[in-house]
């Protein structure tokens, strides 16, 4: 797997994924985020088995593939990098490298095979409903918080 994307774009989505992940997981794989690169799109997934997050961002896919990496470390590395394009590559032995394009910086993380990542359960169609933005805002404005 190899893909290139803009640092700020992926960092924003990884930040949201990190909020989903609990700091005290019973399974170590739940501290990871799943990255699936194919057809010029990167799918990012995170779960704590109760709440799940999935998003897609446009990327330049050189080689399609999938892996999972420790979300907190990935986010820390992304925050330390300068803005611009970043190359992500999965190498031998699930070694996941992160390299800013045109910079001589190289980070490596150990990935875990994606087949160990739990499947995200989707709600059935009958559990969804549509709500206008105005109605939603009106309901939120009528909410009272008690302490």
Residue ranges, per PLM feature:
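Structural preference for solvent-exposed beta-strand-turn elements
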Residues: 1-147
């Amino acid at each position: 797997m190899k893909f290139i994307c803009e640092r700020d774009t992926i960092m924003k989505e990884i930040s949201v994924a990190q909020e989903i992940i609990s700091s005290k997981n019973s399974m170590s794989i739940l501290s990871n985020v799943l990255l699936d690169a194919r057809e010029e799109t990167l799918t990012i997934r995170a779960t704590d088995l109760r709440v799940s997050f999935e998003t897609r961002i446009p990327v330049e896919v050189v080689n399609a593939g999938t892996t999972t990496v420790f979300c907190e470390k990935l986010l820390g590395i992304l925050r330390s990098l300068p803005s611009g394009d970043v190359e992500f590559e999965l190498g031998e032995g699930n070694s996941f490298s992160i390299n800013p394009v045109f910079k001589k910086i190289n980070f490596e993380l150990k990935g875990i095979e994606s087949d160990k990542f739990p499947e995200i359960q989707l709600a059935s169609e009958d559990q969804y409903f549509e709500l206008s933005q105005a109605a939603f805002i009106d309901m939120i404005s009528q909410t009272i918080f008690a302490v």
